[in-house]
């Protein structure tokens, strides 16, 4: 068989050698001399084949990245579902409150939500826009004022109750003040000392 160029001859030899190396166990593949005479398209094809064969480390890395992305998607979906459930619960409680059907558990939840919102308002960082900052400060003051008034009323009511209980116990004789007995002077003092 005659070849018109060295390139076509090397292509034919490479193809035959490749065929023999895959079929016969004792034959060797292409030598470095022959591989250098391969066309650029064949070299590119071989390079792409080698790139497609990933090492174990690369496979692990890709698997890890895919797992991380999947975990992130699941986490985001759970957060969205949790946020939706909270919002639905809030709207249900708000509806019950306007209807006057608020249960004790729902009232506790509202108190907890108010405390949480007050704390988050107290922790708000600095804001650059003065209009937004002034509006936010006004809202914060209104909420804190309402919360303080409720707290003050409750504290005053508790203190009044404690005072009434104490006075009623003293009047009944259940408890007594420590100190002087009525009509007696303290020990060690004379009647002549009038200071």
Curated annotation (Swiss-Prot):
Q: Which UniProt keywords apply?
A: Nucleus, Transcription, Transcription regulation
Keyword Glycoprotein in record:
no
Against InterPro entries, the record matches this protein to: Rrt14
Location(s) in or outside the cell? Nucleus, Nucleolus
Query: Could you tell me the superkingdom of the organism this chain comes from?
Result: Eukaryota
Q: What is its main location?
A: nucleus
Annotated Gene Ontology cellular component terms: nucleolus
Q: What does this protein do?
A: Involved in ribosome biogenesis, probably through modulation of rDNA transcription.
Family (UniProt): Belongs to the RRT14 family.
Q: What is this protein called?
A: Regulator of rDNA transcription 14
Name its species. Debaryomyces hansenii (strain ATCC 36239 / CBS 767 / BCRC 21394 / JCM 1990 / NBRC 0083 / IGC 2968) (Yeast)
